[in-house]
Amino acid sequence: MAAQEWDWFQREELIGQISDIRVQNLQVERENVQKRTFTRWINLHLEKCDPPLEVTDLFVDIQDGKILMALLEVLSGRNLLHEYKSSSHRIFRLNNIAKALKFLEDSNVKLVSIDAAEIADGNPSLVLGLIWNIILFFQIKELTGNLSRSSPSSSLSPGSGGTDSDSSYPPTPTTERSVAVAVKDQRKAIKTLLSWVQRKTRKYGVAVQDFAGSWRSGLAFLAVIKAIDPSLVDMKQALEDSTRDNLEKAFSIAHDSLHIPRLLEPEDIMVDMPDEQSIVTYVAQFLERFPELEPEDFVNPDKEAPIESTFVRIKESPSEQGSRVLLLSENGERAYTVNQETSYPPPDKVFVCDQLESPTGFCLDSAPSHKLSDSSTEFMHEIIDQVLQGSTGKTGSIAEPTPESSILSTRKDGRRSNSLPVKKTVHFEADLHKDASCSKDPFYSSDFRFEGSPKATKELSKQDGHVSLAEVSKEKKKSEQEARLVLEAASDKVPESTVDGLDAVPQDAQPSQDSSFCNGTVESPSSQGEKGPPPSSPGDHTLLANSTELKVQLLTVEPMDKEDYFECIPLKASKFNRDLVDFASTSQAFGEDPSSHEKTRGEEEGSENHAEKPGKRKSKSPRAETEAAESRLEPKKLEPPPKDPEQEDQGHALPPETPADKKPKVYEKAKRKSTRHHSEEEGEAESGFSAVCEEEIPSAPPSTSVSLETLRSHSEEGLDFKPSPPLSKISVIPHDLFYYPHYEVPLAAVLEAYAEGGEDLKSEDTDLEHPEDSYLQDSREEEADEDEEEAQSSQSSCSFSLPVDNSYPSVSEHVSHVDGSSEGPTSALGPGSPPSHEDHQPKETKENGPVESQQSQEPPNPELPTKPLEEKLTEASTSSKKKEKRKHMDHVESSLFIAPGTVRSSDDLEENSSEHKVPSRNSHSDSSIYIRRHTNRSLELDHFSYVQLRNAADLDDRRNRVLNRYNSQKLTELILQFYGIRADMKREYKHARLSMTGTNSSGEAVPLGNQSPPNDSLTQFVQQPDVIYFILFLWLLVYCLLLFPQLDVSRL
């Protein structure tokens, strides 16, 4: 055993010795590398001396102190050699070295554990440590600028990593702290240099993590050189060369071309652990020679841009335009998005994807690629040429227009308007193109056209500006002017960009776009005439801002036939809808026709200016398309009747322009798009008064997931939506209306709900302004994800009737027009809305929609005149005021609506408004909401189609949740009330309990801030058996709590 143990000890000792030898070898190797590097660096500076000095053996030559003093003299510019005394005596050498060290200390270079004796003896570790501190302080720290001269310098020994082993003085706590501080400062300076190197090499795909192993391949050196002069290095070739070749090439190029001294050799780097300090010393020379590169943070755009991308500066277009067209292919499918961001003026830039797929993406027809794919490059170049040349009428068909894929081909010219002057973002999907042919044409026909790009782009950008202005209705005048300019330009250019490409769009829907886009110049006069004080006349489908023609093809955004299209539609599509809604509001303010709003929609699809979430629209897409037809039909009923007739008229005028082949596709699409297309057609029929509504309704095509965000607010303002036919039409949604596509409720459904309930809701909005309205919109967003299906079904099932009179007033911009024509629209709505609704909506929706719209119109009519348009708008804008007004008017409204025999109470109105607005959540304080809905159950069955019945369960759940929240709130209020009751009230408690109803109402008044529900709401609340029992229980509980203390007192 002893022998074995002995052998084990010997073996361990041998292993330890071998390890020590390896460490020593590494240490010696590092010292040798540092010695060579530092010697070269010192000689580099000593050459400046007069006479020049040279170091052959650093450890020997530095012992007399002359080399050290000469080096410091060159680096600092101060005279030190005059103090040098040459002598062979050690004492004189120590004196020379001490003077040099004293100078360093005076220069705030704090040296740790380095004394003159060690330097005079030639201690390798301390000599290298001294030189490294000099390099770090006089070169690296000054270059990086991290540490000022006033801060102490770091003193890290180079190779050994410590100096105490060779120091004659043992380290003290103070010395250790100094070392720690020095190391920290050194790391900071090196880190700064590393950051500079990383910025220089990042764009070449070289990852530099440190100053050691990252440089072994030589690519980092080459990348730094290439950052300074790209012509000196070929990185592709470097990837194929060996490490030695790369290192040799880097050092040679740096020396020969950049005049950077060759401090390193390939052998110094081609080791397992390259010396960090040597590499830092060498790399710092690049920063020293080329300091102008230090602040450079930008990356070469040519290197960063994708290979397939091209940037084109449109100098001719105004900066305001900021047209940016981006064509992208998604998921291998030919899905393309054209973005023109004009909400804020970005630099005029056109981003065109050179991939062949992108052109095919433009062809949204049933044929996925068609001929556009073949001419993708040509298409890109043509678009760019058009943009640069500014040829207004020249949009050579890049791809031959196919019968179905002729979405880009203009109806007149028979050529595709592939030009990209898009006002807003457009998303095209190859699969969607069948149904989303509308989106194709609107964007490409008039919006994407770069014909006379300066003009077209300017106009388009102006329209985009319109859309952004639509978001801000306050800038109505400015947006009107821009819209007019855009409309005029669009009318000039739109004719070429026909909606024929809108294969999926129904002829009615397409005609509106076609007439506005294809025949924009021809129809623009009529449209303008129609638009005039009212919206565009039914005869023309073009959208006009006042006297100008704004042609917007929103149909492009919605593929109607396939429900899956919405799923495929990128987030930008939803954005597009959202933008369209905003633009609709703006266009309405400008008195633009729905077509113009649609156009903006198409443009806005990709724009991210609006609050609508792309994801929401996406989620909406599949169901939205399926239910879109049904729900849209119903909502269209509710949509302001005047709007629909105009849309119908426009739609009818447009169908001749649109190819019949596209009609079938368009029909389903139209159902989803019909809201806006209907609105446009109906709006044309009732152009005088329903142009605004028309714009509003079509602007939010359900399937297109056109944002109806503004739908709600407009409805509150009293927008009149006639039941729009299922066929797609061009329309502009007032920017007050907010439609959240994540609710799968079709746009048409919401719009028609507004149309039928227009009058009722109008009076309700003006008189009662339920807190529910504003609250519903907020809750809609909050519960969007949870209640997408419910909300969609509720919107489709629950058609809300907005006051017809309010349709124009609701649009803030239309208010001026409405003033003259508000009565006309109202009168027209009565007769015109049902016909238009019947024409375009499915039979069921036609029947139900007109009836409900008429009924809803009748009760609200008395109050509509009472409420001025401005007041309605104001109420819509201020949800809080609406809540209070509605609370106070709840009682009055219930009487009003009950009088006609419709059994509509303020609750019913509230329910309608909530449904109309996709009620995701009712206000906590409004007790009448729940009761109202139950009382109107029969009305829902009578007036709403089977779709509404299908969603009854969802509505009940919502009501129950609202009731529960209300009950909890009431309980809180009661508790607070009882806590506030005084002692004398305790004695009178029994009496108060007997008069529970009176107490309840009074109790509402007692707590400040808890009086949110109106008295009649409380009465209705009390009338419910469950609520009454619950309140009785609470009263009994409080009574017992109050009685027990008295019993205790009597016992005492």
UniProtKB/Swiss-Prot annotation:
The organism's place on the tree of life at top rank: Eukaryota
Disordered, as annotated region: 148-178, 391-420, 455-545, 585-727, 758-929
Q: State the GO CC annotations.
A: cytoplasm; membrane
Positions bearing Phosphoserine:
537, 679, 724, 856, 925
Q: Where is the composition biased (Low complexity)?
A: 148-168, 792-801
GO MF term list: actin binding
The chain residues annotated with the modification Phosphothreonine are 710
Presence of keyword Phosphoprotein? yes
Read off the InterPro entries from this record: Actinin_actin-bd_CS (IPR001589), CH_dom (IPR001715), CH_dom_sf (IPR036872), CLMN_CH_first (IPR047827), CLMN_CH_second (IPR047826), LINC-complex_assoc (IPR052403)
Q: Where is the composition biased (Acidic residues)?
A: 780-791
Q: Which UniProt keywords apply?
A: Actin-binding, Cytoplasm, Membrane, Phosphoprotein, Repeat, Transmembrane, Transmembrane helix
Gene Ontology terms: biological process = negative regulation of cell population proliferation; neuron projection development
Composition bias of kind Basic residues appears in 880-889
Tissue specificity as recorded in UniProt: Expressed in testis. Expressed during testis maturation process and in maturing spermatids. In brain, it is expressed in neurons of the hippocampus, cerebral cortex, and thalamus, Purkinje cells, and also in the choroid plexus and ependymal cells. Expressed predominantly in dendrites and cell bodies of the neurons, but not in axons. The level of expression increases during the period of maturation of the mouse brain after birth.
Here the segments flagged for biased composition (Basic and acidic residues) are 455-465, 472-495, 594-614, 622-651, 659-669, 711-720, 759-773, 836-849
SMART domains for the chain: CH
List the CDD domains hit by this protein, alphabetically: CH_CLMN_rpt1, CH_CLMN_rpt2
The segments labelled Actin-binding in the record are 1-288
List where Polar residues composition bias occurs.
509-529
Where does the Calponin-homology (CH) domain lie? 32-139, 187-291
Quote the Pfam families the UniProt record gives.
Answer: CH (PF00307)
Q: PANTHER family from the xrefs?
A: CALMIN, MUSCLE-SPECIFIC PROTEIN 300 KDA, ISOFORM G
Protein name stated in the entry: Calmin
Q: Which gene encodes it?
A: Clmn
